[in-house]
Amino acid sequence: MGCLQGKVAIVTGASTGMGQAIAIAMAAEGATLGLVARSAGPLEEAGSAARTEGGEVLTFPGDVADNELAKRVVRTMIERFGRIDFLVNNAGTNTPHRNLADMSVADWNQVFSTNITGAFLFTRHVLPHMRMAGKGQIINISSGAGLAPSAPAGVAYSASKHALHSLNDSINLEERRHGIRACVIAPGETDTPNLDLRPRPPAKEELAKMLRSEDIANAVIYVASQPDHVSVDMIVITPTAPRNYQADYERYVAEGHTRVSLD
């Protein structure tokens, strides 16, 4: 019997990369899942992969920053399964334009909408049900860019992930009295499809040195499997072999690819 047998979880950003790996790992441990992502086709593929591990999986295509979607997902999971034990706020995006001078208002808003507003909305809607149960876990997938500004990750992404760390701390500050725990997981460079959005995507030999999505999924299982009296507040995961990814960014700037435009 898996360590999450009988538990119910919502995972956002579940169609690819870390989110898909998290969904499959939680399903393998017995969890019933509600998966959320923008792209319906890849989301259904991820749902099918999770179903092969056993257990029931519902999929909800849509934008995590849509308040009505967040309400519908939570309502449906409660109506079908009667509980929500875990929320994994994994949905994240970035823009190819990383500098302040390069970034449009639309770029900024899109990154914050997905990376922090979505986490806020889903957290807001699961809280009443977790409070009623007297327990629950919210796991926020951040980044090393949430610990220190990262030029390769960009100003909007770094700022949004710092905000996610603050949201995590606020959840713990306000909700532990209700038995609700929050953990933020901050991975270093991880081989996911989001790397294709970098101004200079890493080469294959560089990808080989990075973390895998399954590494982050294993950390989620570790956090989710802790007893109710244990709170893991933060996990930082880094590749054993550090890579000079700052050099990618410096070459990109030196080649004159920044656009420096204002709305």
Segments (PLM) and residue ranges:
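Conserved glycine-rich cofactor-binding loop
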Residues: V8, S15-T16
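The beta1-alpha1 cofactor-binding region of Rossmann-like NAD(H)/NADP(H)-dependent oxidoreductases
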Residues: G41, P61-V73, V105
